[in-house]
Amino acid sequence: MAKTAEPKSKAPTAKTPAAVPRTASKARESARSRRPGTAPAYQHMPAGATFFELSRLMVVGIDSAKGQLIQKAQTSPNGPWPSAWSVIAPGAWVIMTAGLTKDGRVAVVAQPSGTTSLSFVTEDANQIGPIDKWTAPVGIGAPPGAFSYQKLSMARDADGRIEIFLTDNLGRVWWIYQNPDVIVQVQKTITPPGTTTPIVVTVDELRPPAQPWSAWIQLTGQLVAITALRQADGRIALFGINSGLNLYRCQQAKAQALTVADWTPWVQIDAGYPFTEMAPIIGPLGGTNLFAMTQQGQVLHTKQLPAGSDTWTAWATPGYSRVPKYTLCAGIRGDGDIMLVASDQQHVHSFNAQYDAATQNWSGWRDFNASGANTRLSLDYNADGRLALFSMMIQNDGTNGLWTINQMAMDSSEWEWTWTALATSNLKQITVVRDLTPPV
C-alpha cells in the first residue's frame, strides 16, 4: 500500500474509502537463483545454489463482520493467492493465533465467542485435492479465573509438541502443552536369527498419552504481551512486555519442560528504555536475536552469545531512524540472514538487511514503500526463498485490509511495486504461517 503522493502506488488512506492499491506495473519477475560472484555478504550458500522448500504461505485470521475464523493460502508453493477466504471452523471467534504441528500442518488455537474456553484445530492430515480440510475444534479449557485474553502465542518444543502461552485480562501468564508420548512395555513374539523357535520378549514402545493436553499452568510474571519462540536447540524462549513497558525474557531450562520449575526466572532486559514492540528470531549462527522498539521509535538489538546460552549482548542499534518508527517485524532471508522491516510515523516502510551475523554488519534502514495509514507488518519466506511482506492496514470503518508484496529475488534489495490485495477491509486479526504440507 503505497502513499497517495506519486510516484508511489496508491493505497487506501484514512480519509477515503478502502480501495485496492493502484499499481505502477503489473509485471512480476520470476525468482532468480543465486549467481556466481555474489557479494561476500551472501555467501552462506554456495554460489549458484538454488533454494526450495516444499511449503506455501497461509494467512489465518478473524473476520470483523461475522467473527469467522478464516484462512487464505497460496494455491501452490510460490503460487498465486485465491480471491476468496475459506472458513476454518463454524461460529464466531474472538482472538486466535496459529503455528505448525509436528508434521508441518497448520494449527490454530482460538477463543469462541461467548466462552473463555479455548479451542484447538488443525489442518486435516488426510488432505485430498485442492480444498483445505480442517479437523473439528477440540476444547482445551480455560485458565482458572480468566475472563478474556490479551495475547496468544504458540511454539513447537524440542519434541515437536505444540505449547501455547497467553496473557489474560489480569496480566497473568498461562501455559498449556500437548502431553508427551508415554512409554509402555509390550510383549512381542519373535524368532531369533538362526533359530526356528519363537520367543516372547518385552520391549518399550511410545504411545499417545491418555490426556492429549496438560492442565493450564500459571507461570510467574505479569504481562500484557507475550511472544514464544522455539530456539535452535528446541527449547522455547518467552519475551514479554508489562503494563509499564518493561521488557522481560525467560526460557525453558531443559528440553522437555513440564512444570514451572523447568523455566528460568524472568529477567528484566529493558535497561531503562520503555519498549512497545518485540520481534525475536533465530539468526544464522544459531543464536536467538531480539529486536525491540523503544517508545521513542528506535529499533534496538540484543542476542544470545554464545548461542543457546543465557547470556546476552548489550543493546545495540542496527541503524538510527530520523523519523520514529511505530511497527516492526523480522524475517529470515533465503541465505539465512535476518531481514527487518519497519514503518515510521510518516507511514514510510523501510527494510534493514543483515549482511554478516558475526560482525553485525547491516545495510541500514532503506525506504522502499509506504502506506496511507497505520499498519501491522509480518514477514515470512516463499518456497523459493523470497521474503513476502504482509501489511494489515487500518481502514475508515475501523477494520483492516491486507496486502502483500515479495522480494524480486532471493536476498534482493528490490521489492515488487505492485501490492496484491488479500482483503480490502473486514479483518480483525491475522497470523502468517508457512504450511509445510501444501497441495502439490
Give a label for each model feature.
Residues 22, 26-440:
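A structural motif
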